[in-house]
Swiss-Prot record:
This is tRNA N6-adenosine threonylcarbamoyltransferase. GO terms for cellular component: cytoplasm. Belongs to the KAE1 / TsaD family. PANTHER family: TRNA N6-ADENOSINE THREONYLCARBAMOYLTRANSFERASE, TRNA N6-ADENOSINE THREONYLCARBAMOYLTRANSFERASE, MITOCHONDRIAL. Required for the formation of a threonylcarbamoyl group on adenosine at position 37 (t(6)A37) in tRNAs that read codons beginning with adenine. Is involved in the transfer of the threonylcarbamoyl moiety of threonylcarbamoyl-AMP (TC-AMP) to the N6 group of A37, together with TsaE and TsaB. TsaD likely plays a direct catalytic role in this reaction. It is found in: Cytoplasm. It holds the Pfam family TsaD. Its cofactor is Fe(2+). Signal peptide: none annotated.
Length: 337
């Protein structure tokens, strides 16, 4: 069984083909980073127009990469939400049109379920149950996962997501968009302990997050200490340490609450090397395991949508020919498979 996956929720156009016996057969990705760089963030209208230009050519490239033709595809999966409404509509329209033309089912996929299941693409996939840390530019959530579609929200950010805080703080430090990875690179040159940022909401019970205050703290620190290269690196280090420590503390609480021994990290920020190292060390001490996808599958991609579509297709999920998307779509609303 082969599923074509289409990802167009934000500023990456991702197309992939997944075979339930052979694994990933094709993976094509186009990033719009250069398109949005001058604006310091994603411009929704530009994102939608670029998806229109890139989606069909990438589908053709994926078919060529896999050596398949349209008649070899058994279902078409597409991201139906959450995300930018215009961008989502491009992928949904193309996906449903192809499904109709090829006479195969169309499978709407939840973007964050795609991220959550991305580690399943690896050679050593996690088994249920586990705690999932979904950490990206738009989401920071802790989820109890006991099966496909069996998701319980344990905590989430009440303001900025961790990835958003990374990008905003990077901009304060004069870094280009997207600044999160550049901030992490700068932080590697910083001196630990010169500046100490707060660990938000760790001094009270609960599993919710708040990262907007760290951006303000960074702005004040920059104002008071100048912007020479070493100072900027030291501020970046302090900021990253604060975010990573906060995420680690909350993960510990979630694992204690659930009693689970497995932790899954997913989303763009899960590619952060410092976060990976700290959580791996933490889970080793707890005699547990941590799982994450390879870096290219942490950010938005078609492979995770193709895989999630395969899982949902086997569970009987299909969509009619109407085109509808959900820019806001709580993960907990998904049915169990």
């Amino acid at each position: 069984m082969r599923v074509l996956g289409i990802e167009t929720s934000c500023d990456e156009t991702g197309i992939a083909i997944y075979d339930d016996e052979k694994g990933l057969l094709a993976n094509q990705l186009y990033s719009q980073v250069k398109l949005h760089a001058d604006y310091g963030g994603v411009v929704p209208e530009l994102a939608s127009r670029d998806h229109v230009r890139k989606t069909v050519p990438l589908i053709q490239a994926a078919l060529k990469e896999s050596g398949l033709t349209a008649k070899d595809i058994d279902a078409v999966a597409y991201t139906a939400g959450p995300g930018l409404v215009g961008a989502l509509l491009v992928g949904a329209t193309v996906g449903r049109s192809l499904a109709f033309a090829w006479n195969v089912p169309a499978i709407p996929v939840h973007h964050m379920e795609g991220h959550l299941l991305a580690p399943m693409l690896e050679d050593n996939p996690p088994e249920f149950p586990f705690v999932a840390l979904l950490v990206s530019g738009g989401h920071t959530q802790l989820i109890s996962v006991t099966g496909i579609g069996q998701y319980e929200l344990l905590g989430e950010s009440i303001d900025d997501a961790a990835g958003e805080a990374f990008d905003k703080t990077a901009k304060l430090l004069g870094l280009d968009y997207p600044g999160g990875p550049l901030l992490s690179k700068m932080a590697a040159q910083g001196t630990a302990g010169r500046f100490v940022f707060p660990r938000p909401m760790t001094d009270r019970p609960g599993l919710d997050f708040s990262f907007s205050g760290l951006k303000t703290f960074a702005a004040n620190t920059i104002r008071d200490n100048g912007t020479d290269d070493q100072t900027r690196a030291d501020i970046a280090r302090a900021f990253e340490d604060a975010v990573v420590d906060t995420l680690m503390i909350k993960c510990k609480r979630a694992l204690d609450l659930t009693g689970f021994k497995r932790l899954v990290m997913a989303g763009g920020v899960s590619a952060n090397r410092t976060l990976r190292a700290k959580l791996a060390e933490m889970m080793k001490k707890r005699r547990g395991e941590v799982f994450y996808a390879r870096p290219e599958f942490c950010t938005d991609n078609g492979a995770m949508i193709a895989y999630a579509g395969m899982v949902r297709f086997k569970a009987g999920a299909t969509a009619d020919l109407g085109v509808s998307v959900r820019p806001r779509w709580p993960l907990a609303e998904l049915p169990a498979a």
